[in-house]
């Protein structure tokens, strides 16, 4: 299961959600546009990462959209 921390104005957040949806992979989205507490919590889990999207898989931090896309190209997103 993926967890994506997003903002409503981020194009890479949209692309990450579209990629996971196109692969029929489930994800939970947490909009941190105005939720600074959730953003700070995610940033701590991600080792200080401050930009969105912040993408996690089974509580492990993946990175941003580029990192997610690299995993897709390597065939590592589908179980």
Model-derived segments and their meaning:
Residues 46-56, 65-66:
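Structural micro-motif
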Residues 23-26, 44-45, 61, 70-71:
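Non-catalytic interaction surface on structured domains
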Residues 1-28:
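Local sequence-structure signature of Cys/Sec-based thiol-disulfide redox active-site neighborhoods
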Residues 57-79:
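Non-catalytic, surface beta->alpha helical segment in thiol-disulfide oxidoreductase systems
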